[in-house]
Amino acid sequence: ILANVLNGISYASILFLIASGLSLVFGVMGILNLAHGALYMAGAFIGLTAAGYWGNFLMGVVVAVISLGVIGLVLDRLFLSRLYKQFNEQALLTLGLVYICANVVMWIWGPWSRIGKSPAILTDSVTIGDFNFSVYRFAIIAIGLVIFGGLWWLQDKTKIGARIRAGMDNKEMTTGLGVNYGMISTAIFILGAIMGGLAGFLGAPIIG
């Protein structure tokens, strides 16, 4: 039972990274981003390619984060920032982006799935009772907890978080008080894209 619980928590940590990025974008910007799963996929392939090229897992993380940040910036500035509260247009655009991203990934990396390798320092297992549990899965759980704490601190304990909450309640009034909510929204979309891509790369050794 303990093995199933720990495995479930490690999977839940990956799902948390995906879902938190999606909910941030929808909650703060009101953007229904159906392409969030495509960002997850892009982060996985970009990170795996970088990690394989440099032979370093950390480089995969860095490249995936930077790449998804740039992709998020481009998507927000060129498309999504113009579609505030236009839910039908958002759905059509982001659904189209899913197909575009899927075809670009297939064109570059082919139709075959890939399994990521965990970093050498985290390849060992810990014996718990009668079973061995991967150190990498423990690391994923820890990363999920750290990000959860970081998001809570950002939202509830900082001035930026207060502005985010105010904008979620009333964007027009917040903007009227002199808050550059457009910049905050762009930063949130970039953060959401990064979290989706990071989940893809970190989850590759577990999910594939």
For each feature predicted by the language model, list its residue ranges.
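Single transmembrane alpha-helix segments in multi-pass membrane proteins
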Residues: L2-T49, L78-E89
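Short loop-to-helix capping motifs
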Residues: N33, N56, D169-K171
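Extracellular/periplasmic helix-loop junction at the C-terminal end of a transmembrane helix
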Residues: Y99-G129
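Membrane-interfacial amphipathic/re-entrant helices at transmembrane-helix boundaries
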Residues: I1-L17, I46, F57-G60, Q86-A91, ...
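Helix-loop-helix "hairpin" substructures at the membrane interface of multi-pass membrane proteins
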Residues: N132-G208
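Alpha-helical transmembrane segments within multi-pass membrane transporters and channels
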Residues: G55-V98, V104
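Membrane-water interface at transmembrane helix exits
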Residues: S23-F26, A51, L75-D76, L80, ...
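Alpha-helical transmembrane segments in multi-pass membrane proteins
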Residues: L15-A19, L39, G43, G47, ...
